[in-house]
């Protein structure tokens, strides 16, 4: 089971309670589904990581994000939610 937390602006990934790796910079929040990790930077961009490697970045004005499979839900600064599938904006609500 993988979990993530943000410490000193970097994502720390834990596996079975042990620190596995750290990655990213200027990170304010992060979430994982066990496979993919999404992180929100201080500039409001969403970064998507797989096994600690950056896959893609997208969005703007992000405050927090959640991930499930290939779908990422991003809460923006203006209170809206943007849904991305494979890095492409699907809908906003």
Residue ranges and their predicted role:
Residues 1-19:
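An edge-strand/N-cap motif at the start of beta-rich repeat modules
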Residues 1-6, 35-41, 70-76:
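Short beta-strand elements that form the blades of beta-propeller/WD-repeat-like
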Residues 8-11, 43-46, 78-81:
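Loop/turn residues immediately N-terminal
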Residues 17-24, 52-59, 89-93:
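A short beta-strand motif characteristic of beta-propeller blades
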Residues 24-36, 59-71:
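Repeated scaffold domains used in trafficking and secretory/extracellular systems
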Residues 37, 46-47, 72, 81:
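Extended, compositionally simple hydrophobic/Ser/Thr-rich segments
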Residues 78-93:
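Blade-level signature of beta-propeller repeat domains, shared across WD40, Kelch, NHL, RCC1
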């Amino acid at each position: 089971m993988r979990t993530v937390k943000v410490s000193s602006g970097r994502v720390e990934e834990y596996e079975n309670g042990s620190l596995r790796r750290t990655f990213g910079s200027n990170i304010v929040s992060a979430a994982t589904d066990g496979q993919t990790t999404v992180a929100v930077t201080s500039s409001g961009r969403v970064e998507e990581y797989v096994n600690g490697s950056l896959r893609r970045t997208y969005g703007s004005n992000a405050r927090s994000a959640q991930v499930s499979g290939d779908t990422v839900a991003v809460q923006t600064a203006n209170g809206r939610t943007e849904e991305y599938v494979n890095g492409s904006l699907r809908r906003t609500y």
